[in-house]
Design a protein with these regions (language model features):
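A short helix-loop-beta-strand connector motif used in the catalytic cores of GNAT acetyltransferases and
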Residues: 46-63, 93
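Conserved beta-strand in the GNAT
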Residues: 64, 70-79, 93, 98
Length: 175
């Protein structure tokens, strides 16, 4: 990795960039999940209005991942969200982490997740958790980052191919 990686907190002025980045990154990786071209989900999850709604939630924080000052990804953290079944831990959820395909394999994902660990620790969190598609190559990445599987979840989106609706719930203890 030659160049400067930067991760910064987003604000509402970043919504347009976040929306475009989310749609592009999602479609580069997850189109196989859908019976359509993924438009139903991306229109629902990554619209300007949806990002505005999520920015209005004081528990949510977005971070832009930049390489040489160009956006290559983003993360969404839910600062105070216990993992069901593990409520005795002060936990943070890594709800979304998306990187452009062109940024894959360069260590940016590892740096972004390490940033999340440090950020969670700065907020005195004992655990960070996430959900990942059970058909995703990301599961191996998360296990290398120290996450362990603690449960399963199933999405109920009718337009999603049934064989790809499974998710794994993963957690990492920080203390």
């Amino acid at each position: 990795m030659n160049g400067a990686l930067d991760i910064r907190l987003c604000n509402v002025n970043d919504i347009e960039v976040l929306s475009a980045l989310a749609i592009k990154a999602y479609k580069e990786v997850y189109l196989y999940l859908w019976n359509d071209d993924g438009s139903w989900y991306t229109n629902r999850a990554f619209s300007h209005a949806q990002f505005q709604k999520e920015f209005d939630d004081s528990n949510a924080e977005f971070f832009m991942v930049l390489f040489n000052e160009s956006p290559i990804g983003f993360m969404k953290l839910n600062i105070d969200l216990p993992l069901p079944g593990f409520e005795y831990f002060d936990a943070m959820e890594l709800e979304r982490i998306y990187l452009l395909k062109s940024a894959s394999g360069m260590g940016f994902g590892r740096k972004a997740v390490e940033f999340c660990f440090k950020y969670a620790q700065s907020k005195h969190k004992e655990m960070i958790w996430l959900k990942s598609m059970d058909s995703s190559d990301a599961l191996y990445f998360y296990s290398r980052m120290g996450f362990e599987e603690v449960g399963e979840y199933r999405l109920d989106y009718e337009i999603m191919k049934p064989e790809f609706r499974g998710m794994k719930i993963l957690m990492k203890r920080l203390t």
